[in-house]
């Protein structure tokens, strides 16, 4: 038991040092981004109506705070270097949109690039970091995502440090999201310059892409913690490329990983099943647990076809996802040793998706029904004493 406790304490300690001290990212960020569904087809109406929908459909009440404008908003720069919005799609400017979003009690995010151009060839922030940061502050921006297109000859830690310092110098707290797609191991330096850092290439709306981005997190869980989080990319839940069973697994695992919960579907015309996944309160609570420890892969069976992912919670409980990656149904057995518990410990188990208590167990728990192909069961296990 002492060895198990020492391992757990070491994980927590590694996850809470060297954080960028801007007072943000005490828990993973939650919100919505325009890219996955709209790509470049954005305008002020889309952004403002999405924000309005987040309030009316319960997303805001569930914790989704940020409304993030991704690439294609920028129109260019004035002669003095100040960036301005595309006058066709954002005729009233970004501050107008920001003021509206703030009036709803939400926050606004903006996109830029560490290179000379963004990925869609709009103006990047290279050499204009201080100018852009001040402009964002004047607009009332709360969140900045900085991409890595046309910056590949640069050192990402140094380049991102420039924008990080520029944002902090404005005096306005702005969440800083780094995005070099994991190419230069940003988890090794991200905590010192940003609040989250992409660890993978862009996610696609299919099973293989989601699974690939998930598995890329397994070796780097100790680099995430309060103040800065590993980012396996925005969620694809609701975009139609996967089944709802797969989307439940996607959302469960992103929640357990302390990944940013950034929705990427159409929230204006969202279906009820997608909304119920994205607003699952007991699942979201695992992501937002204040202990801030990222979940990790603790056990695999059958060559990785069945997996157990787990994380400790602030109340002494454990959150667990029993994950079946196989194309056939399966049962999965969880041993207490897998989750840093003594075999004799009595644990009360709750299913977070059905919101039902399953009883009290010692030593182990085996799923009482077959887990469907690409499906999961998400549990909390709480000591009875």
UniProtKB/Swiss-Prot annotation:
GO terms for molecular function: alpha-galactosidase activity. The keyword Protein biosynthesis does not apply. Its EC number is 3.2.1.22. It is an enzyme of class 3 (hydrolase). It holds the Pfam family Melibiase_2. Keywords: Carbohydrate metabolism, Disulfide bond, Glycosidase, Hydrolase, Signal. The active site is at 147 (nucleophile), 202 (proton donor). It catalyses: Hydrolysis of terminal, non-reducing alpha-D-galactose residues in alpha-D-galactosides, including galactose oligosaccharides, galactomannans and galactolipids. Substrate binds at residues 180-184. Belongs to the glycosyl hydrolase 27 family. PANTHER family: ALPHA-GALACTOSIDASE MEL1, ALPHA-GALACTOSIDASE/ALPHA-N-ACETYLGALACTOSAMINIDASE. This is Probable alpha-galactosidase. It comes from Dictyostelium discoideum.
